[in-house]
Structures are given as structure tokens and as C-alpha cells.
């Protein structure tokens, strides 16, 4: 009886809570990975420079290609608009397939995370294999998790509700960053290794438990006429066919790409999101540099470390408020407001100058928090694009994972452009080359900055001024570009309501929706 009560409590959890918990099991691993993997291989395993850059180059290519590759392999059977016959998949079966994939790939992600912290091969080979394995499983988990957001709910309100719990659990998962400081020690790596084992075991078991709960919810939808865990918009409890046999005519990759090229809102969205991804990674890459050259004389090293940790947690907490605004005003209006806020704060900081330290500190923190928060809201926009893609091309099932993968393919180059363009602009303006004088550790370091070599007195003001203009002019430029591209995006208001209505009409037997219990 003692075991029955916790089990009954778990089975009674709302679907949105179970779905959101998957973000926790990813976040507790990924934030620690981002902070420490570079420092581990450079400082602990002593990887040489050539092996490091070869690994990063291969990783860059793999990271760009695996999203559309895995999305295509997952969803290509859903693309045909032709009627199909024979044995097929119901909407429930599609969701079950995604949940089953998460049940496999989640524990494998945890296992690949462990492979970073134990030396088992030459450093260069281990670096390459670990990065590719980890990113591959992370991509599979992210694609299916995001695809479920589009498959479990259709209404904007319910998708916002699902995303609310993702942000809540992601914020909780980000606390692993703070805990990691107590264990990180490059000289004695055993305690940090044990900490990572604990995280990996917790994450793997969490994925197994959460996916089992989701699977039971979806299977109960067929047996329970009331569908207590999941509400059926139009007949999920039945077994209507969505996807037929492989003998039916399938769409080719070339035809799918041509359809995307005609999808106007998709093109405007990825143009805007490319700038957003660039800005997010620019902030991540240069956050330690800005702290060092603009604030290090006025704040302690421990304060900088706390600011770095808070910068991982605050966007998730802030996103909870943004999501409440989305329910009231819609995602389009909130995102547009955030772009205007970014532009206004940047112009204010530019006019104030680098000597207003309290305003500067607030701007550095808020710039990262609001930018990261915007990135997290854009997942909701992609789910709307999934709906529009289904309606425009009369698909038998929404190709959610594939569309998320195609968005990633177009926008991930922003990750590469951010450090390249940032270092080039700094060198162009100040003559200071970060590659020749390493003033900061990589963002993956546990410590935001080491003691830098003292620059010549004449250089210091120029470098500080260059960092300041980089800090404010990049957000201004990004905001202007994004306001233009976002103004061309029409999937909001009446058009969005029309798309939602048409999707319901086209797929009355296909759509799951979340019941808030």
C-alpha cells in the first residue's frame, strides 16, 4: 500500500507536468556540459590545439546536418498529401512512436554525457567521438520533445501551458550549474566525476519514468471514452488511419524542399531566427569578456561567477512571465515587444556611455536574459508553422520533427558566425586579436575569467571602449533586422485562427489536446 500511493500520485500527474519534466532531465546534463567540456579536455586531458580544432570542425558539420537528417528519417512517411490505403498509423500511434523514441534516446544521452568525464581513449579521438555522440542523442531528444509540443496540443493556450512547464523544469535543471561549483576541481577530478555520474543516473531514470507515464496516458486515450488524461478534439479514441502503407506515393526530399521554399512565413521566420540564434550565442561567447573589461574592476570574481550562473537560470524564470503574456496578447505581439525592448535598452545604454556602471551591469544581465527568453518563445512559433505546413500542403499528418530540423539547419550557422564576427569586429575596431592574447577562458570554463595580462595603459581605454560598442551596437543591429523580418511574418491574428480551424477540419481524427487537470 505504501508503494501504491506514490504510484497513484505519479499516474495522476497532469500530462503537461510529465511533458515538462523531460526538459529537466535534459537541462541538468546540458548546462554542465556547456560549462565544463572545453575546460575538461584542455586543462585536464591536455588535448593539443590541432586535435581540438579538428574535433570542433567535425562537430560543427555534424551539428548542422543531424537535425534535418534525423527529422527526415523520423517524419518522411507523414509528408504525402495523397490518400493512402492499407495498414497505417493513427495519431495516437505517432505520439507513441515519439514517446518511445524519447524513452530510448534519453538514457543514451545520459550515457554519452558520462563519456566526457572518464578518459578512455586518446584525448583528440575521445573529444571527437564524445561530441558527435552527445550531440546526436541531444538532437534526437530535442526533435522528438519539440515535435510532441505540436502533436499533443493544437490550441495556442494549451501549447503555451506545455511550454510553461518546460520553462519551469528547465529553471530547476539549471540549478545543476550552481551545484557543480562545489565539485569542480581540475587537480582532483574524482568528486566532479561522481557528481556527473549522479546527474546522468538521475537523468536516465527520469527519462524512463516520464516516458512510461506519457505512454500510459496515450494508451488510456483509446480505452477510456472520456480520455481522462488527454482530451480528444475529434476522435483520438478511435483508430482512424493517418499514414498508410509504404507502397503509396511518397514525397521526395527535393519536393519537400520546394514546398518549404514556397512557404513564405517559414522563410521570414528562419531569417529572423538566424539573427536570434546569432545574438544568443554572441551573448554567451562574449559574456565573460564584457564582465572582464567593463565590470571586473568593480565586482569580485565570485560575483562574476554568480552572474554567470544566474544568466543560465533567469531566462527560464523570466519566460514564465512571458508565457503568461503570450496567453493574453499572443506570441507574435510578445516577441515584437521584446525586439522593441532590446532596441530601446540598447539605445539608452549607448547614450548613457560605459561609465554608468549600475546601468551597465543591469544591461549586460538583461540583454542575455531577454535574448535567451525570446529564443525559448520561438518554439511556439515553429509549432504554428507546423500547422500551416500541414494545411498548405494537405498533409495526412504534421511533420513536426522534420520542420524543427529544417529550422535548425538554416539557423544553426548563427552559432558559428557569432564568435567569428564578434572577434573580427573587436579586432577591426581596437586592433586587439583575442587569438594572439588569450584574455578569457572559453565559455565552457567554470571560472568566467582568469587574471589577464596587464595591457599597456594606452591600450586599455581603447579595448574597453571597443567592448562597450560591441555590447550595444550588436543588439541594435539585430533588433532592427528582426523588427523588419518579423513585420513580414503574417501567421498571427486572423490568419493563425484560420490555420487552426482548417487544421481541425482537415484532421478531425488526428489531433490530441492537453487537458489541464
Curated annotation (Swiss-Prot):
Chief location category: membrane
Induction: Up-regulated under low-oxygen conditions.
Membrane topology qualifier: Multi-pass membrane protein
PANTHER family listed in its UniProt record: TRANSMEMBRANE PROTEIN 180
Residues in the Extracellular compartment per record: 1-11, 75-100, 152-155, 224-264, 326-330, 394-402, 486-517
Stretches assigned to the Cytoplasmic side: 44-55, 119-126, 180-191, 293-305, 351-358, 430-466
Organism (species): Homo sapiens
InterPro entries named among the record's database cross-references: MFS_trans_sf, TMEM180
Keyword terms, alphabetized: Cell membrane, Membrane, Transmembrane, Transmembrane helix
Top-rank taxon: Eukaryota
UniProt protein name: Transmembrane protein 180
Subcellular localization: Cell membrane
Pfam families, sorted: MFS_2 (PF13347)
Tissue/organ expression: Highly expressed in colorectal cancer cell lines but not in the normal colonocytes.
Gene Ontology cellular-component annotations: plasma membrane
Residue stretches spanning the membrane: 12-43, 56-74, 101-118, 127-151, 156-179, 192-223, 265-292, 306-325, 331-350, 359-393, 403-429, 467-485
Disulfide pairings: none
